[in-house]
Amino acid sequence: MVAAPDRLITLAVVTGAHGITGEVRLKPFTEDAAQFKAYGIFSANGTPLTLKKLRPDPKGWVARFSEITDRNQAEALRGTALTVPRKALPDLPADEYYYIDLIGLPCVDPSGQSIGVSVAVENYGAGDILEIEKADEKRFMVPIAQAVDVHDDHLVIAADFIE
């Protein structure tokens, strides 16, 4: 179970400029700054950005990229997603997965009957939620920890959670 290797994965979003020398504030979608630094080069709407420096900030991280040298350039990046290709993410143990790998997988009930396809993974604070779209295009959500059994090529949804 792996998403397309060239699919872009958003690791952070630029939330604004920091100072006058081109640094940007980031909202990270990963907790590990060391791993974020290891990627080195990110895509910002198709433009490569080379990470020079990263430090913590009360609202996320502050980063400096080689290509961004002043506040105007930094401000222009506000709202820009910083992405890497899926193939750049490290391999995981057999019993772990990235949420991106769940999206697009067929969902079935315990008997193997098709329910729909997974379309999103969300977290509203109480745990991870899988959103499933049925054939009639109606959607419903299930808690991943209690209701989803992950297989390489499909997801089995516990009967009690199927709408």
Curated annotation (Swiss-Prot):
Superkingdom, taxonomy of origin: Bacteria
> What is one Pfam family matched by this protein?
RimM
SUPFAM superfamilies, per the entry = PRC-barrel domain (SSF50346), Translation proteins (SSF50447)
Biological process, per Gene Ontology: ribosomal small subunit biogenesis; rRNA processing
Q: Which UniProt keywords apply?
A: Chaperone, Cytoplasm, Ribosome biogenesis, rRNA processing
Q: GO molecular-function annotation terms?
A: ribosome binding
Gene3D superfamilies for this protein: PRC-barrel domain, RimM
* Location in or out of the cell: Cytoplasm
Q: Which GO terms describe its cellular component?
A: cytoplasm; ribosome
Q: What are the coiled-coil residue ranges? A: none
Where does the record place the PRC barrel domain?
Answer: 94-162
- Function, as annotated: An accessory protein needed during the final step in the assembly of 30S ribosomal subunit, possibly for assembly of the head region. Essential for efficient processing of 16S rRNA. May be needed both before and after RbfA during the maturation of 16S rRNA. It has affinity for free ribosomal 30S subunits but not for 70S ribosomes.
Q: Which family does it belong to?
A: Belongs to the RimM family.
Comment block on domains? The PRC barrel domain binds ribosomal protein uS19.
Record text on subunit structure and interactions: Binds ribosomal protein uS19.
Tell me the protein's name.
Answer: Ribosome maturation factor RimM
